[in-house]
Amino acid sequence: MNIQHIDTRHGTANQANFSNGNCQPYTGVPFGMNYFAPQTTDQKGSWWFHPDDHTFQGYRLTHQPSPWMGDFSYFVFTPINGLLPENTLFHAQSSYRPEESTFCPTHLTINQLRDGIRSTLIPSMYGGVLTIDYYKNESGLLFRFLVNIN
């Protein structure tokens, strides 16, 4: 089996009142300290990703074992172009096409339509490498610390 053919979105079409597996589209290395996933909403608690959403809020560094258990010590970082009216996820989020993105255990690739950004995140044992291709002249990165320490 070729690991590049695995789509990590399987089992992720969940809500608090209906489960299709309660999985998240994690990208990481086996026994890694952290995992990464795209965040598509910050309005649904522990269900912060849905495969049918077309909004990309950023890459989430997560420790969430299950939506029912919640996340801890997480944060979201978003590639941006130019200045934002406010430093919020709402102002930094962008639309994206899930069908043109790569959701793989070894890497995530997202094309942000509003900002003209293509980014690829490759995980490592303790972190990861984020490659960002900007198609405009004003590059940046918004770190949004949404830390919830229980």
Describe each model-derived feature in a short phrase.
Residues 1-150:
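Accessory carbohydrate-recognition regions in carbohydrate-active enzymes
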